[in-house]
UniProtKB/Swiss-Prot annotation:
UniProt name for this protein: Rac guanine nucleotide exchange factor B
GO biological process: actin crosslink formation; actin filament bundle assembly; endocytosis; exocytosis; intracellular signal transduction
Gene name of this polypeptide: gxcB
GO cellular component entries: cell cortex; late endosome
Compositional bias segments (type: Acidic residues): 940-952, 1155-1167
Keywords: Endocytosis, Endosome, Guanine-nucleotide releasing factor, Repeat
Reported function: Involved in the regulation of the late steps of the endocytic pathway.
Sequence ranges assigned to domain DH in this UniProt record: 632-846
Length: 1198
């Protein structure tokens, strides 16, 4: 029983042997006879159909486990009809006494793993994967391997990171092209962070393990497709995306019946004709109406309301809505969307006619919010209804007037539903309710108090007085005040009707400064080409996108969430309300005079008014243009003095509240910190403070400003930073550049010492706060005190000196900007700026040197069994990474490159020592002859295919001064470019990225993980070799040139000849150089196609074996030259001259043209012997080349 329920294959119940012996051997008998001949325990095979239509056959209990359940022998029941099976089903159930084995029955429940796999398969979409693959290939310009799964291609995260950098360059600074899991996970995490930076929502992301552990690859595919669609919105990216062509969406809506228009029969007919069923919720297109009203015709002429073929357009259900905005913003947008200026104007005119008083203020709400006019309207209808009207300015009295008016409306006969709340008017919560109430009151008075013969409220539909027509053209017969909330925006959407009034022949005269405003907007939005304003400024600005983007550019902050691609009228009004609300909160000007409705309908005067408002409040450059040059210069000088005062105050705050108590505690029995610990945190803080007090004193004395003789103890006194000069007159001829030149010499040493100690101080504070409770209490007390003043903590004060030098440079640039070139201070300011810039460069270099030492020290501490001290010489850390040694097949080989050596270690973390690496070998770069590229077959084919269109390279014309003119260098660049080409992807999985480091004794072939990494390693190695060679040659040159004063002329000739080939000063053997150059050029021509960069040391431009017999060399060279000239007879002389050979990390691009450069008598004195004098050179030994992999096993065994 339990066996059948759980489907366990280990609990099979076998039927008795008696039942198994009764098996019928006659396959030709029918089903009924077969049932009779079978024993009571023998059952036929019933067929049950599952939901998917598959048949599951349950075998009888007599079946033996030796018999396969998938037997191919036909069953008699399979040929019987389904009706006979159903007729005997009841009988079969009664006769069933056997047990069905678990192998013969479908399990009633599945495992969780199987369910998860089924769900993953159900979610997987192969077409979506192909879309993602194709887009990645198109963007990265590569070809992904079809035989690899999506998981295998993207597991390491490298392609994803490259994809992000293609969409926005430099987003991911470092891509770990490694096989180590945590580095691959780091790539995926960087990709996910970059997706958020680019604007993807969290719902479109995935977890790192979904990709790295293949948990749910469908989420990764979906993410890439969503990113492909989002790519069209990324600024600066104009490449391929998946969003499709951007279409202009044509929208047509059916507005609510016009409130003040006739011709309602047409609208009703439209509704009857189009809404054929109650369930049809699709809106009616007004373009289907025939003989509609003029309002409808004007709306149907709107290009936004028709499709391109003239037929009615439908609602676009998938309209892209903006991101979620705040509830208050949506409420304001809704009220502005329902607002109608025509209704407001009609209400204002009616109140003015009834009270015979004009509105005192241009704003409707501001004129009514005191409640006086409203109370007078009630008293005009029913005299003495409101006995006392408050004329005071206090808020509660104004609100009392509004409350009395609402009570008066009830007395007149209005319902409570026709009223509004007091805050709706006084706080302008909902001005639409107020307008609605006034219209209802006017219609009610015209109907119930007609004997008073009060003025009639205007009918907006026909623009005249419509008797009892009132609201909606029907005298309010529908009885629904909610009709007042319906907006007439739909009937004007896209028409810009506000621009075509009949005030001047139907044409609006644009403001005089409209062109100036247009140019100003285009200047600030020059980076946003899609937002540039064209000829129709009204239509370009009415959606609010351009003005909101302009605000973000000027304020350098996010204005809010708005629709960047508005489509619906709601989007337009949402942007406009956000714009007005931002200006209301951040501007000193009143924006209540600007109506959202006017902006929506493109009123050019309102748009120009709000543009002027933005320019006057947020464009500081425009504000500065109206200020004289001397005044601007004075403001910048005031800022210099003010920031210096503030800086001195901050320095003295730390000194008096922290350093002094710590120093005083040294005299006690239990000091808080030791003297060394205080110095390690604050460094030379006291010297900085004293120097800047003196500098501030000089500034004030120079500017004839009052200055108290400050000391360190009182330098933190409050200073007035708002007006430095006070009532004194600023002298325009005053100079401050000389003060910087005289007093800023202290910056170099003081700030260098402090900045070098900053990282140490930052870490020391964190460590001491954890270990020293007294120090933690002192720092917490200091920070609590600062919270009440400026909110800065100790770390904020410690970083101030680092930022000060840069601040000086920026301030000096501003002073120079507003100082005329004829001013006596101009040149001194220029010199002061350059001096401080040099100080900043020196500080940066010193900082880099300190960081380099710390890096080398950390590397040394991470290597066990290191046999020498990395700090014993002055060396620079360059790079590090995994490199596989050829033929060792080990992935744990790790290399550190320094300026003078290459360190080989094994990645082997040790729990005992806590060190990550184990020392193996060191290679000194002064023993390296060449670093050459080794192209694999795939790389070589790609290079050959790419030669025709490889592009032009600098120096490709054979220029002697161009480093990239070398054929090998061009080959490297072509091979690098071909890595991104579709031609190099057929056998990418088998591509080996290797290069060779060659010495006189052996060659070391290293394998990188990618082509880019290989090129970077080679470039860094060659740069180190060149630096090493130049350093040795400079030392050798100084020694050689000082040996004999009589040979100065000859030395000069050699120097000039060597300078002509753009190489450092070397001691060269003339004959060997010429012969070797000829030999190398020929060899390069002969072996260039094979990319053979591993020539013997005797063939290099630097003659290592200079002591070999010259006669033998000359004979060999002549013979080689003869053979090569025969083989390369078609090569021109110019090609031979421009053929280059890579030597010890730099190129000699131009060989010597003749043997007459150095005379025969001088050739013995000028020989290159690997940077050493010829006398100290050991006897020459023919170079032997062995592969380093032959001896690497011995190193591993050490």
């Amino acid at each position: 029983m339990f066996s059948n329920f759980f489907g366990s294959s280990k609990r099979n119940t076998i039927a008795s042997s008696s039942s198994s012996s009764k098996k019928d051997k006659d396959n030709g008998k029918d089903e009924s006879s077969k049932l009779k001949n079978s024993g009571s325990s023998t059952l036929p095979k019933p067929i049950t159909n599952n939901e998917s239509g598959n048949n599951f056959i349950t075998s009888p209990s007599v079946s033996s486990p030796l018999i396969s359940p998938l037997s191919s022998s036909p069953s008699p029941l399979l040929s019987s009809s389904s009706n006979s099976i159903q007729s005997t089903s009841h009988q079969q159930q009664q006769q069933h006494q056997g047990v069905i084995t678990s192998l013969q029955m479908k399990p009633s429940c599945t495992s969780l793993t199987d369910d998860i796999e089924k769900k993953k398969q159900a979610k997987y979409d192969s077409s979506l994967e192909q879309t993602a693959r194709k887009w990645v290939c198109d963007v990265l310009e590569i070809q992904l391997e079809d035989d690899k799964t999506f998981y295998e291609l993207f597991k390491n995260g490298v392609l994803l990171c490259r994809l992000i950098n293609k969409l926005r360059g430099g987003t991911i600074k470092r891509i770990n092209e490694s096989t180590i899991s945590f580095k691959q996970l780091e790539n995926i995490e960087n990709y996910l962070k970059a997706c958020k930076t680019l604007g993807l929502q969290s719902v479109n992301l995935f977890n790192s393990i979904d990709l790295h552990e293949n948990k749910d690859i469908s989420l990764v595919i979906t993410n890439i497709v969503v990113l492909g669609k989002h790519a069209s919105k990324i600024e600066g990216y104009n490449g391929i995306h998946l969003a499709g062509e951007r279409k202009i969406i044509k929208i047509t809506t059916t507005p609510v019946s016009p409130l003040f228009g006739g011709n309602h029969n047409n609208n009703n007919n439209n509704n009857n004709n189009n809404n054929t069923s109650n369930g049809d919720l699709s809106p009616v297109s007004i373009t289907s109406a025939s003989g509609g009203s003029s309002n409808y015709n004007s709306y149907s002429n709107n290009p936004l309301n028709k499709s391109s073929n003239g037929k009615k357009a439908k609602w676009r259900k998938s309209v892209k809505i903006p991101a979620v905005s705040s509830l208050n913003s949506d409420i304001r947008t809704k009220e502005a969307f329902k607002f109608s200026p025509e209704l407001q104007k009609a209400a204002q005119d009616w109140i003015e006619e009834v009270t015979k008083e004009k509105f005192k203020l241009p704003s409707f709400s501001s004129s009514l919010k005191d409640g006086i006019l409203l109370c007078r309207v009630i008293n005009t209808i029913i005299p003495n209804t409101i006995l006392y009207i408050n004329n005071g300015n206090s808020s509660f009295k104004k609100m009392e007037n509004i409350g009395n008016y609402l009570k008066g409306c009830l007395v007149v006969g209005l319902k409570k539903t026709d009223l509004f709340d007091t805050p709706d008017l006084f706080e302008e919560k909902n001005i639409n309710f107020v307008i609605s109430n006034i219209h209802v009151l006017g219609n009610h008075v015209n109907k119930m108090y007609s004997h008073l013969k009060l003025p009639l409220i205007k009918n907006i539909g026909n623009g005249g007085n419509g008797g009892n027509g009132g609201i909606g053209g029907g005298g309010g017969s529908d009885g629904s005040p909610l009709k007042m909330y319906s907006s007439i925006i739909h009937s004007k959407f896209g028409n810009g009707s506000s621009n075509t009034s009949s005030g001047n022949g139907g044409v609006i005269i644009p403001p005089e400064d409209m062109k100036d405003l247009k140019d100003w907007i285009n200047h600030h939005l020059r980076a946003h080409h899609s937002l540039q304003i064209g000829s129709d400024m009204s239509n370009d600005l009415r959606n609010g996108v351009t003005l909101l983007t302009l605000l973000e550019e000027l304020t350098l902050q996010k204005v809010g969430i708005f629709a960047r691609e508005p489509v619906l009228p709601w989007h337009f009004m949402q942007n406009i309300c956000l714009l007005l609300n931002f200006l209301r909160e951040n501007s000193v000007h009143n924006v209540s005079d600007i109506s959202p409705h006017d902006l929506f309908n493109g009123d050019i005067h309102s748009l120009c008014m709000i543009t002027r408002l933005i320019r006057e409040n947020f464009d500081t450059d425009h504000q500065m243009k109206s200020i004289p040059m001397d005044t601007r210069r004075q403001k910048v000088i005031e800022e210099i003095i003010a920031t210096e005062q503030s800086y001195v105050k901050s320095l003295s705050t730390v000194y008096n509240l922290l350093i002094v108590p710590l120093l005083n505690s040294l005299d006690t029995n239990s000091p808080i910190l030791s003297n060394d610990e205080i110095s390690s945190i604050f460094g030379n803080w006291e010297h900085l403070l004293r120097s800047h007090i003196n500098l501030l004193k000089e500034f004030k004395l120079k500017l004839n400003l009052p200055f108290n003789d400050l000391t360190i103890d009182d330098s933190n006194q409050n200073q007035n930073h708002n007006n430095i000069f006070g009532d004194s007159i600023f002298d325009s001829n005053i100079t401050i550049g000389d003060v910087f030149l005289e007093k800023c010499e202290f910056l170099k040493d003081n700030y260098t010492n402090y900045i070098n100690n900053y990282d140490n101080s930052y870490q020391r504070v964190k460590r001491l706060k954890k270990s020293n409770s007294n120090f933690e209490e002192l720092v917490n007390t200091f920070e609590i005190f600062q919270d009440t003043h400026n909110g800065l903590d100790l770390y904020s004060y410690l970083i101030m000196p680092i930022q000060r030098i840069v601040r000086y440079i920026l301030l000096l640039k501003e002073v120079i900007k507003y100082t005329p070139s004829t001013h006596p201070d101009y040149q001194m300011l220029q010199n002061a700026k350059e001096n401080i810039k040099r100080v900043a460069d020196h500080v940066n270099e010193s900082k880099m040197a300190v960081e380099n030492k710390r890096k080398i020290l950390s590397i040394q501490d991470s290597i066990q069994n290191l046999q020498f001290n990395l700090m014993d010489k002055e060396r620079t850390y360059i790079r590090e990474g995994f490199l596989e040694i050829e033929d060792t097949f080990k992935k744990d080989s790790y290399f550190f490159l320094f300026s003078d050596l290459l360190l080989f270690v094994k990645y082997k973390p040790s729990e005992e020592t806590g060190k990550e690496f184990k020392y193996k070998e060191v290679f000194y770069l002064d023993q390296v002859v060449d670093v050459s590229d080794i192209l694999s077959d795939d790389e070589g084919e790609a290079c050959v295919d790419g030669d025709d269109d490889g592009g032009e390279y600098e120096g490709g014309n054979g220029d002697a001064t161009s480093g990239s003119a070398d054929p090998e260098d061009q080959t490297l660049r072509r091979s690098c470019n071909s890595n991104n080409n579709n031609n190099s992807n057929s056998n990418k999985s088998n591509t080996v990225y290797s290069f060779e480091i060659e010495t006189c004794e052996f060659s070391l072939v290293l394998l990188a993980e990618s082509h880019t990494e290989k090129i970077e390693w080679m470039e860094d190695l060659r740069s180190c070799l060149q630096h090493q060679l130049i350093k040795e040659e400079d030392q050798l040159s100084s020694l050689s040139l000082s040996d004999n004063d009589d040979d100065n002329d000859a030395d000069a000739d050699v120097e000039s000849s060597l300078n002509s080939i753009s190489s450092p000063l070397l001691l060269l053997n003339n004959n060997n150089i010429i012969n070797n150059n000829n030999n190398n050029n020929n060899n390069n021509n002969n072996n260039n196609n094979n990319n053979n960069n591993n020539n013997n040391c005797k063939n290099s431009n630097i003659n290592i074996n200079s002591s070999i017999d010259n006669n033998s060399d000359n004979n060999n060279n002549d013979y080689d030259s003869k053979i090569n000239s025969e083989e390369n007879g078609d090569s021109s002389d110019e090609e031979n001259k421009t053929s280059n050979r890579r030597s010890v990390s730099f190129k000699t691009h131009k060989r010597l043209e003749s043997d007459e450069t150095i005379s025969d008598t001088e050739s013995d004195d000028y020989e290159l012997v690997c940077g050493r004098s010829k006398k100290s050179q050991p006897p020459p030994v023919p170079p032997r080349k062995i592969t380093f992999s032959d001896t690497i096993k011995n190193i591993d065994n050490q």
